[in-house]
Amino acid sequence: MISICCSRFSCILFLLFLIFSLVLSYIWWSPTKGGTNPEVLPVVLWHGMGDTCCVPFSLGAIMNLIVEQTKGGYVRSLQIGGNVLIDWQSGFFIHPNEQVDYVCKQLLQDEHLAKGYHAIGFSQGGQFLRAVAERCPNPPMRNLITLGGQHQGIFGLPMCPTLTEKPCDYITRLLDNAAYAPEVQKALVQATYWHDPIMENKYRLGSTFLADINNELFINKFYIENLQKLKKFVMVQFLNDTIVQPKESQWFQYYTTGQNKVIQPFTESKVYQDLGLDKMHRQGQLVFLGVEGDHLAISKAWFIQNIVPLLLEK
């Protein structure tokens, strides 16, 4: 009975969110802001799961903050599809490859971005923007900043620590057994970056997104060359994250193959060389930032101190 009540309550909250968002879409909704200061590079944002491009209390507030701190810089928050509902659904039900292709075309058509731009990805938007950097070098991305991105994927459920060990493990294994089925890969975004460290071959062969952008199927030199064109690749890990499991995936780390307890050092991972991260590391292009707090829990002061200076770079 409790779970049913919680489910109903969640549904009511979601419906209220959609109604509120639809109302806002006719009042304040704008995927672009600023543009009066040509001296700073434009900024592109990609929201995370369960969010949309422009809600005033979410990415809309981030847009306003960036415009303020860059004194009128152009900001584009990516909206997938033509309205708020499609944009929200994209976080769950539109395959990342389709979304990345759509975004690449949109960015190419935006004349504000022709000379380059900085990019900030929130949660899964982080690895989606990395795919843009790898697949679509024009217009050129300068600094890529990922806040809580899952660059090595996930192997756990949101808020799973609130469950006891047995049901948590059972649900996780149930998802894993179905995650790589073609119909699930096609239908559920999160399945495309579900990374089973115990059955690596199953992951590599079944993943239709993450295994590709991490060069785990074959070495795509085009991806390496494009990623290395970044001035900086900044990865922010939330040190008390209860959503992303393992949280170290935010720093491109993951479990050592064959188990799901011990984290392999970044420099010892296969992707470190296969994606050309070793060269970027040696040249100082990789930046690792840690922030105390749960998933995407950052303050305005922290953002201004740590992220804004990166957006002011040429």
UniProtKB/Swiss-Prot annotation:
Taxonomic superkingdom: Eukaryota
Tissue specificity of this protein: Ubiquitously expressed.
Membrane spanning residue stretches: none
Glycosylation sites: 240
Catalytic reaction(s) noted: S-hexadecanoyl-L-cysteinyl-[protein] + H2O = L-cysteinyl-[protein] + hexadecanoate + H(+)
Pfam family, any one: Palm_thioest
Covalent S-S links between cysteines: 53-54, 104-136, 160-168
Catalytic residues of the enzyme: 123 (nucleophile), 241, 295
Biological processes per GO annotation: determination of adult lifespan; endocytosis; nervous system development; neuron fate specification; positive regulation of synaptic vesicle endocytosis; regulation of axon guidance
The keyword Chloroplast is assigned to this record: no
Keyword terms of this UniProt record: Disulfide bond, Glycoprotein, Hydrolase, Lysosome, Signal
GO molecular function: long-chain fatty acyl-CoA hydrolase activity; palmitoyl-(protein) hydrolase activity; serine hydrolase activity
InterPro entries: AB_hydrolase_fold (IPR029058), Palm_thioest (IPR002472)
Primary localisation category: other
Cellular component terms (Gene Ontology): extracellular region; lysosome
Signal peptide: 1-25
Entry EC no(s): 3.1.2.22
Further comment: Flies deficient in Ppt1 are viable and fertile, but accumulate abnormal autofluorescent storage material in the adult central nervous system and have a shorter life span.
Protein task: Cleaves thioester-linked long fatty acyl groups such as palmitate from modified cysteine residues in proteins or peptides.
Protein name: Palmitoyl-protein thioesterase 1
Organism lineage: Eukaryota, Metazoa, Ecdysozoa, Arthropoda, Hexapoda
